[in-house]
Amino acid sequence: MNKKIDLYSSSYSNYSLETYSEVRLETYGEDYGQTSWVSTEESHEIPELLQLTSDSSVLDIGCGSGGYAVGLAKRIGCRVLGFEINESGVKTANALAEDEKVSDLVKFEQHDASEELPYEDDSFDAIYSTDVLCHVPRRREVLSNTQRLLNPDGKFVFSDALVIGGLISYEELENRCPDGLYFFSPPGINEQLIQESGLKLLEARDTTANCALLSKRWHDAREKRKEALIACEGEENFLGVQRFLAGVHRLTSERRLLRFLYTCSK
């Protein structure tokens, strides 16, 4: 069994280091603290799918280091509440909101997405969650929570990067699970759970090609900065992350592991 690696906590805690910023910029074409499979084009389209305006109240499920939520507040002027189970992510996110002078619009809290959330019914105009639900054991509860929290005219966008598309070996599955919890979905299960939660599916879009491209860019950007990254995270962790990214690229480029973006309404 491969030793688990630190993928997310190290990225969150090293968010402000120049080397990690360079990796993100080379991977995505812009830098707001990304650690997901959201392409730049997709990140720009999400506000349109959510129909955001300056009056919108938005919930970010699994906000990571908060960069995307902060960017929404700066670009659109909407109010964003983000939550994240990782303590380092929440700490980094709130510090970023202060630094970017949007703490009046953006707030971050620590919660578990699969637990009952302390927010009122119909309290958000838009909810989004990028590549998070595949780490949550009770996906049905998350979707039911979302249906409860979304106002009657609201939109919900989420992505799942772990939809099974073909034969995958035990070793490949193990490599695809570097740290934390990972849940792989058979085709059609997300559509089924969306319907059972009371949400309406508007679109299910295959974005696997973006995942294949980003994983290759991410791997190569890190490889160029090998010495600096080893100094930050250690050689064993560096090599583990590189194996992970190479594995993601292989599985997605061969379409044995798929990613979908789902747009829903209440």
Question: Where would I find each of the regions flagged by the language model?
Answer:
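A short glycine-rich, Lys/Arg-flanked "PGG" loop and its adjoining helix->strand segment in the class I
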Residues: R140-K155
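Short alpha-helix
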Residues: F183-G198
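Conserved Class I S-adenosyl-L-methionine
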Residues: R205-K266
